[in-house]
C-alpha cells in the first residue's frame, strides 16, 4: 500500500550568522531571513515484520535540492522525500553551505520517526567537483564553496604543468584547479586547512571525522582509483597536505554522532558510510551491471555514464572514468539539461506542451540550450555561447527543438566515448526528472538509434541508499 502525504513544514529558523563554527569567517554578521519549506514524502506500509527489519538511508544533494530514500535489504523503498534548497540562497554562493546544512537537517526531520528508528546505515551523494576548504581543527569553512560548474582558469596553467597531458584535472572546473586557485590566494594558516567535497562535508556533519572522501568524488582532485593512491606528481605539491583520505564508496567511516541519534531517534549503532557523486549514484540506482549499459541522468544538467571494460580519460573533451568495482564508468556532464527548461517553461507548460509533440518527427531547429556561456561535455569550452534562436511562434515547436537538441548533445557524448575507446553503448536507461517525460524518451530513442528506457529506480538517493546497504553488509562481515 502506498501512502502519499503532502504537508507544510512550519517556519524553519536558518542559521543567524555565517560566523558560526562550520560556516564562513566574516567581519560582519549577516542575519538570514526565515523561510518556509515544503516537503513531499512517501511511506510504504503494509509489510509484515516492519518492526524488526533493518533499513538503509541514502540522500542526494543535487544542483537544485535534496532527496532521501530509505530501503530494506531487498531494495524495496520504505520512505522517500525531497526538499528544495532555500530559495533566497540559489543565486548567492556565500549561502550554499548553510543551505545544504539546513536541507540535510530538514530531510532527516522529514523521515517518519518509526522509519528513523530502524535505519542502520547512512550514505549520500553530492555534485561532482563541488569543493569546500575547511579549517582542519574547527571545521570552519574558510571561503565560498566552489560549485561544480565554477571554473578557475587562473589555476589551469599551473595544474597542466604538473599533471600528465589530458588528465582529468586539466579542466578549469576540476577540484584540483579550485584547490590551486584557493592556495594561490595565500590566505593565513592555509597549511592547516583541509579539502572536502560537498558529499564529504555533509557526511562529516553526521560522523564527525574530518578529512575522509571516496574515490569517485576524489577523482577530479587527482586521485588514481586504479592504483588506489594519490600520484607522486600531486603528492610533491605543497598543498597536498590538504587532500583527504580516500576510501571506496560505501565504506563504513564510523557511527552516527550521538547528537543526531538523540535529536532524530536513529539507533545508537547506526553507521555512516562514504558516498559518491550524484551522477554515479543515479547510475547505481538504475542497477545497470553489464558493459555497454548506459545511464543518462536528466536533472538540472545532463550527465551520461557508460559501463566499460576500458578506462577512458581525456580532459580535452571533458571525458573521465570512475571506478565501479572491476569495471569503469566512463562519461561526462553537460551544462545543458533541465535547468534551461525550467528557466523557459513552468512544469505545467512542460507537461502540456510535451503532449502536443510528435516524437517520431525530427525538429529542424538546431539549438545548444545553456543557461549561460560555458560547456563541459561533449565540448570543453568555457566560452561556448547558448544558442536558442530562431524561436518559432509555436511554443510546442520551440520545446520540441530544445528537447531534440539536448538529445543530439547526448548522442554526441556517446559517440565521442566510443571514438575514444570505451565499450559501445547498447542500451540507455534514463534517470532524473527528465525520465518522467515519455515524449522526450521517444525523441531520444530516435536520435540515439538505441533502446532508451526508464530506469526502474530513477533517483540518485536510491543509489546512495544502496551504498548504505553495501556499507552495512561489509561492516557486519556479510
Curated annotation (Swiss-Prot):
Entries under Pfam families matching the protein: FGGY_C, FGGY_N
UniProt KW Transit peptide keyword: yes
SUPFAM superfamilies linked: Actin-like ATPase domain (SSF53067)
Main location: plastid
Residues given in the record as substrate binding sites: 60, 64-67, 278
Compartments where found: Plastid, Chloroplast
Gene Ontology terms for molecular function: ATP binding; D-ribulokinase activity
GO cellular component: chloroplast; cytoplasm; cytosol; plastid
CDD domains (alphabetical): ASKHA_NBD_FGGY_SePSK_AtXK1-like (cd07783)
Keyword field: ATP-binding, Chloroplast, Kinase, Nucleotide-binding, Plastid, Transferase, Transit peptide
Enzyme Commission number(s) from the entry: 2.7.1.47
Uppermost EC category: transferase
Taxonomic superkingdom: Eukaryota
Catalyzed reactions per annotation: D-ribulose + ATP = D-ribulose 5-phosphate + ADP + H(+)
Cofactor(s) essential for the protein: a divalent metal cation
Keyword Metal-binding belongs to the record: no
Transit peptide: 1-38
Positions contributing to ATP binding: 300, 338, 433-437
Family: Belongs to the FGGY kinase family.
Known role: Exhibits ATP hydrolysis without substrate. Can phosphorylate D-ribulose with low efficiency.
Name the UniProt record assigns to this protein: D-ribulose kinase
Organism (species): Arabidopsis thaliana (Mouse-ear cress)
Name of the gene: XK1
Amino acid at each position: 500500500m502506498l501512502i502519499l502525504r503532502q504537508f507544510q513544514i512550519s517556519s524553519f529558523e536558518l542559521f543567524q550568522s555565517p560566523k558560526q563554527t562550520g560556516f564562513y569567517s566574516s567581519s560582519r554578521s549577516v542575519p538570514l531571513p526565515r523561510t518556509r519549506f515544503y516537503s513531499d514524502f512517501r511511506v510504504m506500509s503494509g509489510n509484515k515484520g516492519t518492526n524488526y527489519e533493518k533499513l538503509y538511508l541514502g540522500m542526494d544533494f543535487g544542483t537544485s535540492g535534496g532527496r532521501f530514500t530509505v530501503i530494506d535489504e531487498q531494495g524495496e523503498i520504505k520512505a522517500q522525500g525531497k526538499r528544495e534548497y532555500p530559495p533566497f540562497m540559489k543565486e548567492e554562493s556565500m549561502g550554499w553551505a548553510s543551505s545544504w546544512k539546513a536541507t540535510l537537517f530538514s530531510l532527516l526531520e522529514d523521515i517518519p520517526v518509526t522509519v528513523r528508528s530502524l535505519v542502520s546505515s547512512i550514505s549520500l551523494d553530492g555534485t561532482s567537483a563541488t569543493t569546500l576548504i575547511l579549517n582542519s581543527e574547527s571545521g570552519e569553512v574558510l571561503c565560498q564553496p566552489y560549485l561544480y560548474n565554477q571554473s578557475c582558469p587562473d589555476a589551469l596553467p599551473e595544474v597542466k604543468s604538473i599533471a600528465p597531458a589530458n588528465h582529468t584535472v586539466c579542466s578549469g572546473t576540476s577540484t584540483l584547479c579550485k584547490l590551486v586557485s584557493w592556495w594561490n590566494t595565500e590566505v593565513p594558516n592555509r597549511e592547516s586547512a583541509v579539502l572536502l567535497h560537498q558529499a564529504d562535508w555533509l557526511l562529516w556533519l553526521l560522523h564527525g571525522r574530518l578529512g575522509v572522501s571516496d574515490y569517485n568524488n576524489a577523482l577530479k582532485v587527482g586521485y588514481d582509483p586504479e592504483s588506489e593512491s594519490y600520484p607522486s606528481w600531486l603528492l610533491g605539491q605543497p598543498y597536498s597536505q590538504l587532500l583527504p583520505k580516500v576510501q571506496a564508496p560505501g565504506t563504513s567511516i564510523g557511527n552516527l554522532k550521538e547528537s543526531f541519534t538523540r535529536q532524530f531517534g536513529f539507533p545508537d549503532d547506526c553507521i555512516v558510510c562514504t558516498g559518491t557523486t550524484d551522477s554515479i549514484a543515479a547510475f547505481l540506482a538504475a542497477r545497470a551491471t553489464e558493459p555497454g549499459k548506459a545511464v543518462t541522468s536528466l536533472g538540472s544538467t545532463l550527465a551520461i555514464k557508460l559501463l566499460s571494460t576500458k578506462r577512458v580519460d581525456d580532459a580535452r573533451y571533458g571525458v573521465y572514468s570512475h571506478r565501479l568495482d572491476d569495471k569503469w564508468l566512463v562519461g561526462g556532464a553537460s551544462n545543458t539539461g533541465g535547468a534551461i527548461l525550467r528557466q523557459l517553461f513552468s512544469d505545467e507548460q512542460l507537461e502540456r506542451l510535451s503532449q502536443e509533440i510528435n516524437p517520431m518527427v525530427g525538429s529542424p531547429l538546431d539549438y545548444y540550450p545553456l543557461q549561460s556561456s560555458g560547456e563541459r561535455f561533449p565540448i570543453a569550452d568555457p566560452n561556448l555561447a547558448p544558442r536558442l534562436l530562431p524561436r518559432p511562434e509555436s511554443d510546442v515547436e520551440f520545446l520540441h527543438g530544445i528537447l531534440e537538441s539536448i538529445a543530439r548533445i547526448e548522442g554526441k557524448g556517446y559517440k565521442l566515448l566510443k571514438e575514444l575507446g570505451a565499450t559501445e553503448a547498447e542500451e540507455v536507461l534514463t534517470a532524473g526528472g527528465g525520465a518522467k517525460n515519455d515524449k522526450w524518451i521517444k525523441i531520444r530513442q530516435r536520435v540515439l538509434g538505441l533502446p532508451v528506457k526508464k530506469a526502474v529506480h530513477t533517483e540518485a538517493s536510491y543509489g546512495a541508499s544502496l551504498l548504505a546497504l553495501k556499507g552495512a553488509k561489509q561492516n557486519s562481515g556479510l
